[in-house]
From Swiss-Prot:
HAMAP family, per the entry: ac4C_amidohydr
MF-aspect GO terms: hydrolase activity, acting on carbon-nitrogen (but not peptide) bonds, in linear amidines; N4-acetylcytidine amidohydrolase activity
SUPFAM superfamilies: PUA domain-like
Species assigned in the record: Salmonella agona (strain SL483)
Protein name: N(4)-acetylcytidine amidohydrolase
Keyword rRNA-binding belongs to the record: no
Boundaries of every ASCH domain copy: 6-94
Ranges annotated as spanning the membrane: none
Entry keywords, A to Z: Hydrolase
Catalytic activity, as annotated: N(4)-acetylcytidine + H2O = cytidine + acetate + H(+); N(4)-acetyl-2'-deoxycytidine + H2O = 2'-deoxycytidine + acetate + H(+); N(4)-acetylcytosine + H2O = cytosine + acetate + H(+)
Similarity field: Belongs to the N(4)-acetylcytidine amidohydrolase family.
Length: 104
C-alpha cells in the first residue's frame, strides 16, 4: 500500500470531500509542500486513505493574522479556527497555509 503524504483529523474528511474545506494550516514540519504537488490524503486516526488533493498555493500566517477568509476556507468560524489551531499547535504562532483542491 502506498503511504499517505498528509493526514487530516477524521472530522474534516466530509468537508474536504465536499469542497467546503480548501486550506489547511500547518506548522513548520509541513512547510515543504508547494503549488502543483499532488498528495495522497489519509485520516490522522487510522492513516486510512480517503482522497487525493492538489496544492494550489502556499503562504504564511500568524495566529494574530488569521482572518474571516481563512475561517471560511476552513469551513468554521474565526473563533473556532483560532481555538482549533491553538489546541493542535500550543505555544506556536507562525503557521503555513496550504491551499488545495480535492481531486478525489
Amino acid at each position: 500500500m502506498q503511504p499517505n503524504d498528509i493526514t487530516f483529523f477524521q472530522r474534516f474528511q466530509n468537508d474536504i470531500l465536499a469542497g467546503r474545506k480548501t486550506i489547511t494550516i500547518r506548522d513548520a514540519s509541513e512547510s515543504h509542500f508547494k503549488a502543483g504537488d499532488v498528495l495522497r490524503v489519509g485520516r490522522f486516526e487510522d492513516d486510512g486513505y480517503f482522497c487525493t488533493i492538489e496544492v494550489t498555493g502556499t503562504s504564511t500566517v500568524t495566529l494574530d493574522t488569521l482572518n474571516e477568509k481563512h475561517a471560511q476556507q476552513e469551513n468554521m468560524s474565526l473563533d473556532e479556527l483560532k481555538r482549533v489551531i491553538a489546541e493542535i499547535y500550543p505555544n506556536q504562532t507562525q503557521f503555513y497555509v496550504i491551499d488545495f483542491k480535492c481531486l478525489r
